[in-house]
Amino acid sequence: MSEFWHKLGCCVVEKPQPKKRRRRIDRTMIGEPMNFVHLTHIGSGEMGAGDGLAMTGAVQEQMRSKGNRDRPWSNSRGL
């Protein structure tokens, strides 16, 4: 049985990760928002401490009904 593990061990070699550096992003690379669609506004008085969770569900449902989720610029996943 040890021969089996020896043969298996020599075939399975961990590949080194490529040394790819990610480009750093600075503020000059970021432009103005494009295709922005304002769906709703939540004021400070609308999200009280007692009803915050219940209100959140209502706002999320309103936002779902407003927009088309198939837009290419939308990267939200399901509010």
Swiss-Prot record:
Region entry Disordered, spans: 48-79
Protein name (Swiss-Prot/TrEMBL): CDC42 small effector protein 1
Comment block on domains: The CRIB domain mediates interaction with CDC42.
Protein family: Belongs to the CDC42SE/SPEC family.
Membrane-topology descriptor: Lipid-anchor
Keywords: Cell membrane, Cell shape, Cytoplasm, Cytoskeleton, Lipoprotein, Membrane, Palmitate, Phagocytosis
Gene Ontology molecular function: small GTPase binding
GO CC, any one term: cytoplasm
Annotated organism of origin: Pongo abelii
